[in-house]
């Protein structure tokens, strides 16, 4: 176990230093609270998935970049450590999509299950579990149909479309900006 953690720490450090060099950040880093640094490093060192290890490095780099104005909160660390590689992959694909900013700024836009399954092959059950975890973490929410005309007394009932159509939440977009966008 110690060797595994040591080996991962070396891999992480290589990724971190390479990204820092590419972005010309050496000596310009914004200091972070030790609590944040320790938690990021602890999670990166035990991470088996190379892509997730890269995401941890990206989070640390982005938060240290003085030119990036990001929401540096502990909750993003906690959310990331509760995500699977496939959930991160989906957010990565969305973050690189051509219509990323358009969908982000239009509350009537949404992503659909079929589009996700074209990019990431998985079973319906795997998709459902992935989406329910992203809902649980607050990164996504079901697309809601406004003005459905259905009322319960004086209260409108706004139906949602479950996991078939979804939106990224403000929390999800902040997570993307913190650890996926370079």
Stretch-by-stretch model annotation:
Residues 38, 48-63, 141-182:
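Accessory beta->alpha helical hairpin/"wing" motif in late/C-terminal subdomains of nucleic-acid enzymes
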């Amino acid at each position: 176990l110690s060797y595994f953690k040591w080996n991962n720490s070396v891999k992480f450090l290589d990724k971190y230093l390479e990204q820092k060099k590419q972005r010309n950040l050496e000596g310009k880093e914004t200091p972070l609270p030790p609590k944040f640094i320790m938690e990021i490093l602890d999670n990166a060192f035990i991470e088996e998935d190379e892509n997730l290890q890269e995401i941890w490095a990206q989070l640390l780099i982005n938060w240290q970049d003085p030119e990036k104005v990001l929401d540096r909160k502990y909750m993003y660390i906690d959310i990331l450590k509760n995500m699977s590689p496939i959930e991160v992959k989906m957010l990565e694909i969305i973050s690189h999509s051509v219509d990323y900013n358009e969908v982000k700024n239009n509350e009537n836009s949404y992503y659909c299950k079929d589009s996700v399954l074209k990019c990431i092959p998985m079973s319906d059950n795997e998709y459902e579990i992935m989406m329910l975890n992203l809902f649980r973490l607050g990164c996504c929410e079901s697309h809601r149909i406004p003005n459905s005309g259905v009322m319960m007394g004086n209260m409108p009932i706004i139906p949602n479309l479950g996991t078939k159509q979804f939106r990224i939440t403000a929390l999800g977009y902040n997570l993307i900006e913190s650890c996926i966008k370079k």
